[in-house]
Amino acid sequence: MPRSTKKGPFFDHHLIKKVESAAGSKRPIKTCSRRSVILPQMVGHTIAIHNGKNYHPVVINENMVGHKLGEFSITRVFKGHGGDKKSGK
């Protein structure tokens, strides 16, 4: 179920403060807040999103506005299905 429109988008205030203070800077902004919605103020910034193990840098563009940060940093690594053990030798 999507969030109610009368509540507005969710974002962590500390992340917005970091984005506003990093205006003009090329350094990525590190965050663990995967639940925050991407706002128009973030466009053009590089945000390093934590995926549980390390930080994955993502450049924010206009098409990402309205999505959540966690959508652009995957947390699971697919190693492949079983397969034939004999072909590996």
Swiss-Prot record:
Name of protein? Small ribosomal subunit protein uS19
One GO molecular function term of this record is:
rRNA binding
> What NCBIfam families does UniProt report for this protein, alphabetically?
rpsS_bact (TIGR01050)
Q: Which Gene3D superfamilies match?
A: 30s Ribosomal Protein S19, Chain A (3.30.860.10)
In this record, what's one Pfam family?
A: Ribosomal_S19
Q: Name one GO biological process term.
A: translation
**A cellular component annotation (GO) from this entry:** small ribosomal subunit
Q: Which organism is it from?
A: Xylella fastidiosa (strain M12)
InterPro entries hit by this protein: Ribosomal_uS19 (IPR002222), Ribosomal_uS19_bac-type (IPR005732), Ribosomal_uS19_CS (IPR020934), Ribosomal_uS19_SF (IPR023575)
Which UniProt keywords are given for this protein, alphabetically ordered? Ribonucleoprotein, Ribosomal protein, RNA-binding, rRNA-binding
Q: What is stated as this protein's family in its record?
A: Belongs to the universal ribosomal protein uS19 family.
Organism superkingdom:
Bacteria
User: What HAMAP family does the record point to?
Assistant: Ribosomal_uS19
Q: What task does this protein carry out?
A: Protein S19 forms a complex with S13 that binds strongly to the 16S ribosomal RNA.
